[in-house]
C-alpha cells in the first residue's frame, strides 16, 4: 500500500477516474468475498451499517492492508458518490485467491437458498478439505508431496456444475439473482484455482506466482463481461502485479503478471500506472502484525 502520501495521491486518481471519466468499478488485490461485502455496502445492497463494519470481513494477514483509515475514507467516499445514483452505481470487487474456505461457505450459502439438492452435492465435494480444517498450507503440503489425494476433481466438478446450470441457478433467487449467482460462481472458480495454487507453493515460485496472477486476470475478465459493454474498471494492486512482466526481470524468469495479461487481452484499452520514488524510506504499516 505504501506511505500515506502515496495512498492519498492514489485516492485522488481513483476518485477522478470515477467522477470525471465515468469508471464503473474498482477491482482490488483483495479476496473476492471480503471485497464483495464492501461492494454491497457502497451500492446500498448489504446489511452493514457503516464502512467499518463493511471492512471487518478482512481477517486474513495482513488485515491492515485493507482495514486502514485510507481505505475506510475511500469506501466512505464511494458510498457517498453512489447515494444519488439509483442506477449504474460504482462497485468494488476483489481479484485475489486466498479465501478458499470463505469462498466455499459463500457457494454453499447461495445454493442453500436456491437449490438445496445442489447444496448437498457441493457439501459432499467440498468435504474433501475437511481433514485440513482451515489450514490451506497443510493441504498444499500434503497433496504436493503425495501424502494425501488432492481435491482437484471435486472442485472442478463443482465449478463445472455451476457453469453448466448458470441460466437455471441465476433465475431462482429473485430480481437480484444475476449478481448473486455471479458472486457465487466466482467463488466456485476461486476454490478451483486456489486448490491448484496451494500445492504449487511447495515447488518453484514461478508456478505459484503465475497461477495467482492468471486467476486475477480470469476474475477481471469475468467481471468486465458481467458489467457489460460500458464497463471501465480501475485495478488497484501492487506494482509487481500491474506492470508488464515482459519488460522486467520477472519475464526473464518465466513469470507473467496481471498487467501483462491485461495488456495482451485488451491492448490499447488498458493503461498501466505504477508508483515509484527517487529516494527515502516507506513505512507500510505502523505495526506489522498488530490487530486492526
Where do the model's predicted regions map?
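Structured catalytic-domain cores with a bias toward divalent-metal coordination
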Residues: 1-292
